[in-house]
């Protein structure tokens, strides 16, 4: 019976200690944030503000994606040839006929 009481007392003390530690960490982070910080003050001086305002985090889908790359649909002209200005008109006429 004494062993059960000792276990309950230990669990109670452990729960109180964990609850106290969690509440102290939350209060500490709230003390740092002051509402009188003006982000325009930093931006006007060429300083990039970092923190709760101005920080941009990269989304997982924004980076380069692995896989096949699209190849541009144009080719380099050889021999110093210049592109024809009438070519877009001819292509449009061919598409209309089809």
From Swiss-Prot:
Its biological purpose: Stimulates prolactin (PRL) release and regulates the expression of prolactin through its receptor GPR10. May stimulate lactotrophs directly to secrete PRL.
Processing after translation: Amidation of C-terminus is required for receptor interaction.
Predominant cellular place of this UniProt entry's protein: secreted
Residues making up the propeptide: 58-98
Location relative to the cell: Secreted
Region described as Disordered: 52-71, 79-98
Single annotated GO MF: prolactin-releasing peptide receptor binding
Pfam families documented for this protein: Prolactin_RP
Record lineage: Eukaryota, Metazoa, Chordata, Craniata, Vertebrata
Any one Gene Ontology cellular component term annotated for this protein: extracellular region
Name of the protein: Prolactin-releasing peptide
Tissues and organs where the protein is expressed, per its UniProt entry: Medulla oblongata and hypothalamus.
Keyword vocabulary terms for this entry: Amidation, Cleavage on pair of basic residues, Hormone, Secreted, Signal
Superkingdom, taxonomy of origin: Eukaryota
Post-translational modification Phenylalanine amide, affected residues: 53
UniProt entry tagged with the keyword Secreted: yes
